[in-house]
Each structure stands twice: as C-alpha cells, then as structure tokens.
Amino acid sequence: VVFRTAMSPGIREQNDMFPMIANLEGKMVVGQFGSFIHGFKEAYDGTIEEGDLFLTTDPYACNGAISHINDWLLLRPIFKDGRLIAYAAMFGHMTDVGGKVPGSLPTDAREIFEEGIRVPPLKIFKNDELQADVLNLILHNSRMPTWNRSDFNALVAAMRTAEKRVIEMAE
C-alpha cells in the first residue's frame, strides 16, 4: 500500500519505512527491528481507545525506533469486539519537516530542535476522525507539505490494512 501511494523518494525509492505488528503485550510478531510499543506507551500518558491512531516524530519517545525527526511513526491499536488485541505500527521517512535546512537533515546540528518540528506521541485520529488541525500544524512547518500529506495518508492506509488483516486472522 505504502509503496504504491507515497510520493517522497525516501519511501518510494529508498524503502525508508518499517511496518510492524505486535501482540497485546507489545512484543513484535511481524517486523524486523523489534518493538517500540513499551517506550511509546511510557511516553504517552493518555488513554488508548478504539478508533485511535497515534503519531510521533520524537526519537526519544519510542526507544529509538526512529532515528530522527524526519521519520513519522504511526501506531494503531487494534480492537476486536471492543477488546484490544494487537498493535500495528509503521514509520516512514518524510522529505522535509522544517528545521534550518531543506530536507531537515542538518549535518551541523547541535541539538534536535534544529532538525524540524518534534511531535510527541499524540492522537492524530480519535474515533477514526482525523484531527485535521493537528496535522495541518505539522504540515505548515514543512517545505514539502503536499508530499508529507500524501505519505501520511499512505501510512494511514497501511495501518488500516494491517488492522483489517489482523482482525480477519483473529476471527
């Protein structure tokens, strides 16, 4: 899904993305780099409900699952019959997220704030409704908002596909 719909070369050409499915305890079931669910849950102090989808760009909020702010990490709790059964997650490298240089990869950065907008774990979807004001705030801090929106939509589509497949397997 992501390769067919993403716009940025980081995802389409360099395959700079990572899908993962984890069980209820947060242990990786499918993926290659390990699970960051525990770190994510420690950094997020709100509720986890059906219809939520979370976003972070903060490498410190997910046990280093992403290495810099250009990586947008999405996490989807998967519910079946009102009960949390698993998690789907994916990160994708965005082309530009603000910061002091185009591409948001300053080689001379002395602190993370020079890389671009740092987003702590937050609900970007509540009850399956996009929090458009939050996404627009993030996109307004990019030199490539159209690409980032398209790539974000590709990641969301991947989360929904993973959710559907996990629920099918659980039936």
Question: What are these model-derived regions, one by one?
Answer:
Residues 118-171:
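N-terminal leader/propeptide and maturation segments of large enzyme subunits in energy/redox metabolism
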Residues 24-31, 38-63:
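Regulatory sensory and allosteric helical modules in signal-transduction proteins
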Residues 31-34, 64-70, 89-90, 97-103:
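Short acidic, glycine/serine/threonine-rich loops at helix termini
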Residues 11-14, 45-48, 66-69, 81, ...:
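Solvent-exposed alpha-helices and their adjacent loops that cap or buttress functional pockets
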Residues 71-81, 89:
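A short, hydrophobic, proline-anchored segment that marks a local hinge/packing element in signaling
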Residues 1-23, 27-29, 148, 152-156, ...:
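Intrinsically disordered, low-complexity terminal regulatory regions
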Residues 84-141:
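Gly/Pro-rich active-site capping loops and adjacent beta-alpha segments
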Residues 1-14, 45, 55, 59-63, ...:
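Short, basic/aromatic recognition patches
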